Amino acid sequence: MAKWNMIPSAEGPFKGLDAMARYCFGLLYNRYQLSMRKHSEGDSRFSEVRTVRLCDAFPYRPSMRNDTSEISMSYAFCIYTQGDLAREMGCTDRTVRRCLEDLRRAGVIETKREGYNGALRFFFPPVVYEYFVREERLKEYNAILAGREG
């Protein structure tokens, strides 16, 4: 049976990342969306309360760019072991570690180790969420314009 995964194109926050790193991001983001669904249904197993500055939580909102006050927010995360990622991607653990480091450096994921020698928790910073929301709004706007012209 065929399996399809989302791989972001090399633009926006993904510019400069190689195809393997973007493929790794696609797998992580797919699992993250499942965690978000559970989180929105009230399941707290895949969420963590974090204290963040408003300017970091909402980077694309001009009114909050310089606001350094802190708030507590509930963040969803996903868990993926490096071994599982390597099997999904068809590569070695070393390649997965390199991809994760590239994604961290690009600022599109944040990680936190779950206990000693445990799996990583993957968080997606607001920059990534805002990027995808903006892209969806742009598609909707273009569809409306195309409908008016047709």
Identify the role of each PLM range.
Residues 73, 90-91:
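Residue-level marker of alpha-helix boundaries and capping positions
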Residues 83, 92-149:
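Winged-helix/helix-turn-helix nucleic-acid-interaction surface
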Residues 1, 149-150:
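Short, Lys/Arg-enriched, disordered terminal segments
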Residues 22-26, 91, 104:
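Functionally constrained cores in energy, signaling, and assembly domains
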Residues 86:
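The alpha-helix within a helix-turn-helix
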Residues 1-83:
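Short recognition helix of helix-turn-helix/winged-helix DNA-binding domains
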Residues 79, 89-90:
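Short, well-ordered coil↔helix boundary/capping segments
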